[in-house]
Regions:
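Structural recognition of the beta-strand scaffold that forms the well-ordered cores
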Residues: 1-4, 49-53, 81-84
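Active-site nucleophile loop of the alpha/beta-hydrolase fold
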Residues: 3-13
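The feature captures the conserved acid-bearing segment of alpha/beta-hydrolase catalytic domains
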Residues: 12-15, 22-75
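Short, hinge-like loop/turn segments at secondary-structure boundaries
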Residues: 18-22, 99-101
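C-terminal catalytic histidine-bearing segment of alpha/beta-hydrolase fold enzymes
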Residues: 62-114
């Protein structure tokens, strides 16, 4: 199972993460696909299920591109649960509020009796 809080879902497609990719991985954008979750899913390397919590008041929302992850998962290989949380930003309080949900979600996939 795989879950995330406010992930940068397609770093090769957003300005700030793409600049970091260029510095660390070089200018060849094709080589970046191995480090881009949306590209990996598009290339058939998905998880059966992914849980993502994203605050709708996140200052970085336009860079995180959750809609790209949602579109990539529609292809059928990955079942995405994308929960847009009203009023939450990109801070500790957001993560601490939903952490138990994520732990229970993973536990339910690992253990039959939870």
């Amino acid at each position: 199972s795989c879950s995330a809080f406010a992930p940068i879902t397609s770093p090769s497609q957003a300005d700030v993460p793409a600049a970091a990719f260029a510095r660390y991985l070089g200018p060849d954008r094709d080589g970046w696909r191995a480090y881009d979750s949306v590209a990996l899913i598009e290339d058939g390397h998905g998880f059966p299920e992914i849980l993502v919590d994203q605050g709708d008041a996140d200052n970085f929302l336009e860079m995180l591109l959750p809609q790209r992850l949602e579109a990539a998962c529609r292809g059928g290989l990955t079942n995405l649960t994308l929960r847009m949380q009203p009023g939450y930003g990109h801070a500790y309080y957001f993560v601490s509020t939903f952490m138990e949900d994520h732990l229970r979600w993973h536990a339910a996939r690992l253990c039959d009796d939870i």
